[in-house]
Amino acid sequence: MPQIEELRRQRAGINEQIQALATIEATNGTLTAEQLTEFAGLQQQFTDISAKMDRMEATERAAALVAKPVKATQHGPAVIVKAEPKQYTGAGMTRMVMSIAAAQGNLQDAAKFASDELNDQSVSMAISTAAGSGGVLIPQNIHSEVIELLRDRTIVRKLGARSIPLPNGNMSLPRLAGGATASYTGENQDAKVSEARFDDVKLTAKTMIAMVPISNALIGRAGFNVEQLVLQDILTAISVREDKAFMRDDGTGDTPIGMKARATQWNRLLPWAADAAVNLDTIDTYLDSIILMSMDGNSNMISSGWGMSNRTYMKLFGLRDGNGNKVYPEMAQGMLKGYPIQRTSAIPANLGEGGKESEIYFADFNDVVIGEDGNMKVDFSKEASYIDTDGKLVSAFSRNQSLIRVVTEHDIGFRHPEGLVLGTGVLF
């Protein structure tokens, strides 16, 4: 095509020269012998160039008729760009677990899975640098996200217990055991001297192991919905055990000493009268007595709240007066007598000789501290067994499952005993 354009420009130039000679002839009437020779030469050049252009154009038309379309496969390879993974609280923990499971515990492959399949470079880097004995050590920032999520699931955390670091697994917190006193005195008389007495709240890390079975059909798959399934299973396993530990464990078997054991130790129990009728008046009076016991203990009551069984909660929620009005309508907003209320299955409703009793916990959770060691480890197994909800030993291999083991360490302590009240023998 460029050659044809050049020939057209040449032919146009020759035509201008021919037209100039023709103008001379038209004006003067005759051309000289030299001009006639030039005219004949230019005319021949014009004819030759035109013929050459005709041949070149014919060649291009013929080539176009027999040309084949370019196939799509002749293009360069497509560039596939994976979408950025969705970020949410707990995403790091979930993707670490999924990567370790997909790689069957091989940390090098797990880091590659996080990078290539999940497209999360930060998780890949965390796996590469967090190897430790007994599993993969979860980085502190990811561990903090898990604690934040547990706050909405564990009622002790939800009601305001404060989480503090537990360096090296131990900590002693000073607490006021006996307050200083004040007195009046007359002129020229000595004031009575008194001082506050302190002792320590000692926290020692207790190891909790959560076994989380995951279907092998989910392993190796990426996606937000799969991640949510894995995350919820992990949080449920941890939160259910934490509720029981923080409220009802007694320190045996390397467990924390929970609220019930401390309330018993400090004589902060308020039993329901066994012969009392269960009705609106007796229930309301009993709840007032629990609050009053906390007040009379000079509790600061900065962040007081209720914890109770599901049965007790529903009894109070559905309690109505003689006009059919709900007695405690504020429970719809999560409050009871002006204080936050939470329920949990970790508080039984089948206690006592007849299996009909339950418990009500009332505490100033501002004085409840949960010491977090900060070390959380994750490990994987395809052959291990676990105990299901019925207490039966289950083989993960026989159920086409894999087990994720999450190891964390913590303890619970209470800075002021007077802020804790435990209602026992509750029949509603």
Curated annotation (Swiss-Prot):
Pfam families: Phage_capsid. The lineage of its organism: Viruses, Duplodnaviria, Heunggongvirae, Uroviricota, Caudoviricetes. Belongs to the HK97 phage major capsid protein family. Residues 4-24 form a coiled coil. It comes from Klebsiella oxytoca phage phiKO2 (Bacteriophage phiKO2). One of its GO terms (cellular component) is virion component. InterPro entries: Phage_capsid, Phage_capsid-like_C. This is Major capsid protein. Keywords: Coiled coil, Late protein, Viral capsid assembly, Viral release from host cell, Virion.
